[in-house]
Amino acid sequence: MSLSSRATLVVLCCLFMLIPSFTTAATEQGLHARSRCESYSFNNGKSFRSCTDLLVLNSYLHFNYAQETGVLEIAYHHSNLESSSWISWAINPTSKGMVGAQALVAYRNSTSGVMRAYTSSINSYSPMLQESPLSLRVTQVSAEYSNGEMMIFATLVLPPNTTVVNHLWQDGPLKEGDRLGMHAMSGDNLKSMASLDLLSGQVTTTKSVNRNMLLVKQIHAIVNALSWGILMPIGVMAARYMKNYEVLDPTWFYIHVVCQTTGYFSGLIGGLGTAIYMARHTGMRTTLHTVIGLLLFALGFLQILSLKARPNKDHKYRKYWNWYHHTMGYIVIVLSIYNIYKGLSILQPGSIWKIAYTTIICCIAAFAVVMEILQFKKRWARLFFKKSKDVEADQPTVSVDVIGETEKAERKKASGGIEIQIENYNITKNFMIPSVFVISYPHTSPPLLAFHSYHHPSTSIAATAA
């Protein structure tokens, strides 16, 4: 037998030895998974013939079902739960969604600690889960809470010979005053629905619907973050900072228009389009995020309309139009950034999304701060330079020349100046004449002339000394 054949035989032997181990592990895992549901015993002594481990939210469903009569006795069991939480289990006899679901709701009173269980019929996508009768007959509704486990018990009567039902289960926080808070809008809370075979206990999920909706929500977040949260601020910065440089005129204007129009219409098509899709499939909830989103589209549309009413640069109303246009633009930017963070808190896609957007916004804000400082220095430098020029123009200028006797005579002759004598460098009399004022004083040999010219915006004076 060759060496390769021996090696192959050894490998096969090892595999055959490992197969029983894999089988045993799988069997133990299956028994363990099955025991999570079947081995549970209720404190009230109730027992159920069937049970199933629900896929998400640490939940289990125990039930007894009589097909001939349609009587369904259930116990919905939710583990690893805070006492300040509410739970719900529902059957939807008409569809797979939330609208039309007939729900059982339970929570623990924050003051007395007593459990409350009641029924609630869900007729919209923004339910308050208030107590209301169901379309199904239901009796013996009760609830229990112990050691982080909350349970709902009830008996429902389904149409006879019903074998498969669409059921939903959910949890959420309990607010002040025992108000039921909104459940999470991401992760497992969006996957808590399935079809239940009452005869076999098999659960069939609707993963495609959940995945499609999650994809739509991600597209909605990305499109709006890029359009309203990034392109819009860049367009505003182009108009504010680039137009101060003549070399960038009119490039800044085209960048501003492209960023604003692209941001608005991409947000209109991608953002509003996905929002309408989600409203049709999961319901339009009147939240602050929704209100701000609609307000942003309205303000953006007004900005577009205002371009038709823009006066010429030399028009007396142009400054008022600029105030309006700039103010509306800044309001849109602030609301956009706030609403993006609001949407991220609803979607809860993971911290990396918020970190990435925050990093981009911080970079844009840092660049804006630097440009504001540069513009401030440039503006004040220009203003200071202008004031210095004005002061310099108002002040007289003085110049002194040393000339010889010959040039002195020529200047005196040309100007018609008056020569007077000065003793001890003290001027005894001043003469203001239209052209030149000449003063002479004794000086040592060789004779020099100190020509002192005094210029003022309104007159010209010269003083000479010999």
Swiss-Prot record:
Domain DOMON residue range list: 57-172
Membrane topology: Multi-pass membrane protein
Annotated organism of origin: Arabidopsis thaliana
Molecular function as annotated in GO: metal ion binding
Disulphide-bonded residues: none
Compartment(s) of residence: Membrane
Cofactor: record remark: Binds 2 heme b groups non-covalently.
Top-level taxon in the UniProt lineage: Eukaryota
The name this protein goes by in its record: Cytochrome b561 and DOMON domain-containing protein At3g59070
Role noted for this protein: May act as a catecholamine-responsive trans-membrane electron transporter.
Keywords for the protein's UniProt record, in alphabetical order: Electron transport, Heme, Iron, Membrane, Metal-binding, Signal, Transmembrane, Transmembrane helix, Transport
Pfam family, one: Cytochrom_B561
Domain description: DOMON domain could bind catecholamines and thereby could regulate the cytochrome b561 domain function. DOMON domain could bind one heme b.
Record-annotated Cytochrome b561 domain positions: 179-380
Positions contributing to heme b 1 binding: 220, 289
Cofactor(s) annotated in UniProt: heme b
